[in-house]
């Protein structure tokens, strides 16, 4: 019996003394005991370490160490008594006990593993189902937002938005530029129209003055004469028709013709002016200015004092001549050198005794020359001509076309011609 591998097997308890499964064995007065509806206690491996087993004995790792939840089981006292009834006799019940014990342990191990797997699977299934119910929407939305297709669509949307914004900005800038151009064009046209209106109003005023000055006075006086004629009763016999014809001839002789100023451009002068307008210059050798110098400027600035006249012309060309009234400086403070160049009653250009109300200064010189109203008008007419062509050269005349510029130049030449012929305007 000492070498028997199953020696001492009857001393091993398959359950803990406190296990509900063997309460019927510990308490003989209890006929039937039920376990907890959901907990079954299994023996711990430490309870089996007292009896060593051989190779064909039970393995400690096969025994469960944790409680396994299962459906409630009911054990009869008869089953417990059967297990314990055979235990005292080891000689007769060792083979049957080993076989039955191995069978029960194997089946119990399989059931425990199945129950554990089932419970773990159920727990995992319930947890995953709960998580899916709670976080399902957020997980799906995050996965969709992070997907490459959504990112690609977002990038394309951003690029499309940037393109649309840039296009809208370009269109806005284009509209602003067009509006500015239209505004500038409208302002230019308005200024030109105002200039034309001023010219037309001046022409209308001149025509009215001309018509009123040239209209005969007899038609206006005839109604007055007829009104003053006393009324006579009866009638007078017209002795002959010759008297009626004679009266009509007298009326025709009294009526004066109505005339108006007409103008027509000389083609040669107009072509020369257009050529000069394309490339404006102040050089007197160009055909346009050379003709004006010969016909208007030189005759207008020709005086008895030739040296002073040449100096005046040079100052006019250089735009350094100044004219000022005599009243700005009292006569008693006039220097002797200025008196030698004329005086309040002697013109320095003609040498004639004339009342001089103005004086000229050439450049920065302190010497003043007294001039008569006639000489002053001739000098100012030339200065006006040079001032206008300088404006054209500098591009300051923008409200007039070529025709208007040409007639303005002709008007200035007309003033120079009248001045050299002796016509001038004096300030009262």
Swiss-Prot record:
InterPro entries: RAB3IL/RAB3IP/Sec2 (IPR040351). It is found in: Cytoplasm; Nucleus; Cytoplasm, Cytoskeleton; Cell projection, Lamellipodium. The keyword Transferase does not apply. Residues 149-212 form a coiled coil. The modification Phosphoserine is found at residues 147, 149, 215, 218, 240, 248. The keyword Nucleotide-binding does not apply. GO terms for cellular component: centrosome; cytoplasm; cytosol; lamellipodium; nucleus; vesicle. SUPFAM superfamilies: Sec2 N-terminal region. GO terms for molecular function: guanyl-nucleotide exchange factor activity; identical protein binding; small GTPase binding. Keywords: Cell projection, Coiled coil, Cytoplasm, Cytoskeleton, Guanine-nucleotide releasing factor, Nucleus, Phosphoprotein, Protein transport, Transport. One of its GO terms (biological process) is protein transport. Homodimer. Interacts with the N-terminal region of SSX2. Interacts with the GDP-bound forms of RAB8A and RAB8B. The interaction with RAB8A is prevented by phosphorylation of RAB8A at 'Thr-72'. Interacts with the GDP-bound forms of RAB3A and RAB3D. Interacts with DCDC1. Interacts (via the N-terminal region) with TRAPPC14; this interaction mediates RAB3IP association with the TRAPP II complex. Forms a heterotetramer with RAB11A where RAB3IP homodimer binds two RAB11A subunits. Guanine nucleotide exchange factor (GEF) which may activate RAB8A and RAB8B. Promotes the exchange of GDP to GTP, converting inactive GDP-bound Rab proteins into their active GTP-bound form. Mediates the release of GDP from RAB8A and RAB8B but not from RAB3A or RAB5. Modulates actin organization and promotes polarized transport of RAB8A-specific vesicles to the cell surface. Together with RAB11A, RAB8A, the exocyst complex, PARD3, PRKCI, ANXA2, CDC42 and DNMBP promotes transcytosis of PODXL to the apical membrane initiation sites (AMIS), apical surface formation and lumenogenesis. Belongs to the SEC2 family. This is Rab-3A-interacting protein. It comes from Mus musculus (Mouse). The gene is Rab3ip.
């Amino acid at each position: 019996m000492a070498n028997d591998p199953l020696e001492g097997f009857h001393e091993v308890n398959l359950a803990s003394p406190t296990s509900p499964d063997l309460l019927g064995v510990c308490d003989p007065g209890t006929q039937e005991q039920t376990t907890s509806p959901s907990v079954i206690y299994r023996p711990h491996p430490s309870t089996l370490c007292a009896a060593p087993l051989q190779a064909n004995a039970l393995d400690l790792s096969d025994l469960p160490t944790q409680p396994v939840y299962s459906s409630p089981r009911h054990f009869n006292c008869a089953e417990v008594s059967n297990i314990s009834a055979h235990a005292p006799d080891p000689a007769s019940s060792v083979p049957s006990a080993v076989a039955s014990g191995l069978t029960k342990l194997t089946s119990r191990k399989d059931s425990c593993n199945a129950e554990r797997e089932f419970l773990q699977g159920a727990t995992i299934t319930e947890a995953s189902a709960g998580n899916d119910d709670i976080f399902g929407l957020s997980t799906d939305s995050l996965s969709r937002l992070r997907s490459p297709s959504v990112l690609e669509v977002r990038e394309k949307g951003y690029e499309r938005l940037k393109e649309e914004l840039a296009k809208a900005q370009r269109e806005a800038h284009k509209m602003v530029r067009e509006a500015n151009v239209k505004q500038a064009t409208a302002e230019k046209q308005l200024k030109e129209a105002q200039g034309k209106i001023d010219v037309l109003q001046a022409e209308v005023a001149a025509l009215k003055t001309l018509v009123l000055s040239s209209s005969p006075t007899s038609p206006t006086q005839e109604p007055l004469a007829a009104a003053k004629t006393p009324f006579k009763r009866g009638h007078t016999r017209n002795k002959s028709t010759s008297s009626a014809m004679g009266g009509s001839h007298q009326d025709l002789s009294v009526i004066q013709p109505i005339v108006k100023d007409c103008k027509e451009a000389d083609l040669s002068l107009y072509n020369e002016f257009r050529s000069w307008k394309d490339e404006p210059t102040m050089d007197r050798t160009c055909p346009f200015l050379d003709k004006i110098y010969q016909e208007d400027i030189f005759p207008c600035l020709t005086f008895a004092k030739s040296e002073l006249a040449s100096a005046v012309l040079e100052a006019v060309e250089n735009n350094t001549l100044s004219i000022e009234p005599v009243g700005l400086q009292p006569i008693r403070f006039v220097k002797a050198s200025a008196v030698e160049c004329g005086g309040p009653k002697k013109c320095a250009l003609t040498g004639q005794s004339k009342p001089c109300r103005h004086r000229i200064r050439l450049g920065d010189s302190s010497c003043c020359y007294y001039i008569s109203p006639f000489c002053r008008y001739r000098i100012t007419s030339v200065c006006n001509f040079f001032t206008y062509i300088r404006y054209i050269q500098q591009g300051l005349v923008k409200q007039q076309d070529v025709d208007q510029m040409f007639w303005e130049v002709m008007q200035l030449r007309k003033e120079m011609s009248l001045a050299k012929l002796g016509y001038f305007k004096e300030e009262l």
